[in-house]
Amino acid sequence: MKNLNNRVLLITLFLVIAALLRLIPHPPNFVPITAIAIFSGAKFTNIKYALSIPLIIMLISDVFIGFYTISLFVYLAFIIITIYNFLRKKYTIINVFASSLLFFMISNLGVWILGGYGYTFEGLLLCYTMAIPFFVNAIAADMFYSTILFFGFKKAEKRLISVTKN
């Protein structure tokens, strides 16, 4: 039980650090939001932890960053991506790309629903088209931050296991 608690704390620490990275200046859409959802879904063994801990951390960081009209869709995407990766349970480039695509589709559908481009099929297509440059940054960020989270966690977890065994 102690090792499980240590693992939950270590995962939470990684999520807090990733959320803090949202507070530093960054290029548009180069943030660890999707990576946080991917990591928490893949690493927590309890779905309640996988959803609640990172959502609480995200809410706290959003208090400092600010909430936007699109926030509901961002959180919806976050929940869906977390569940997707909870079911997958591993880090693969395909899972990261699929998660990036899910975030892109859901968040930009939200932009369209909130009236950003007119309520027509052409407006929806324009919305997605205008978002493509941001999607490129998002994919790069998702690959970058996911890699750091997963490989950093693997090293830290090995270190934690060796420390607790001694």
What residue spans do the PLM features occupy?
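Juxtamembrane/disordered regions of integral membrane proteins
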Residues: 13-19, 56-60, 65-66, 89, ...
